[in-house]
Amino acid sequence: DSQSVKVSNHGGVRGYDAGKKVLGRKRHLLVDTLGLILHVVVHSAAIQDRDGARLVLSILQQRFGWLRCIFVDGGYAGTLVDWVKQLLPRRGLRLQVVKRSDAGKHRFKLLPRRWVVERTFGWLSKFRRLSKDYEFRTESSEAVILIAATRLMLARLA
């Protein structure tokens, strides 16, 4: 999943996310079923979610050969599913789209696996440094997110 955040005025890569009306950057997270971050990519907010997901999923072959199923929300349906089938056909990787139920529009319904990455974004929002992107380089932004995730994991162990 992705999250759009504003950037500070000192420069760096930025773009406009028209859907969320944010001038800044997007953070894409790949998390496991516990909500622990496996991979993070930060880029301009002008890049669509499906294209940003390709940046995240392109690393799967090298680093995460043990993954078999990836849960994504409805925003990633369509061409991304076909792209994964073409890119990694022999690995047995499956992209499962978890769609919202339109039956209960006005009620909250907990959908399986959809809330895991949202919960991770909620955990990361506790860190003031991540409320806005203060870093000049996107690589530095990724490192700050991984540091925050490390602190969260260490707090669970304690």
Predicted regions and their residues:
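Short gly/pro/ser/thr-enriched loop/turn and capping motifs at secondary-structure boundaries
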Residues: 102-105
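Polybasic low-complexity intrinsically disordered regions
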Residues: 1-91, 96-100, 148-149
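Basic, amphipathic alpha-helical segments enriched in Lys/Arg and hydrophobic/aromatic residues
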Residues: 78, 82, 107-158
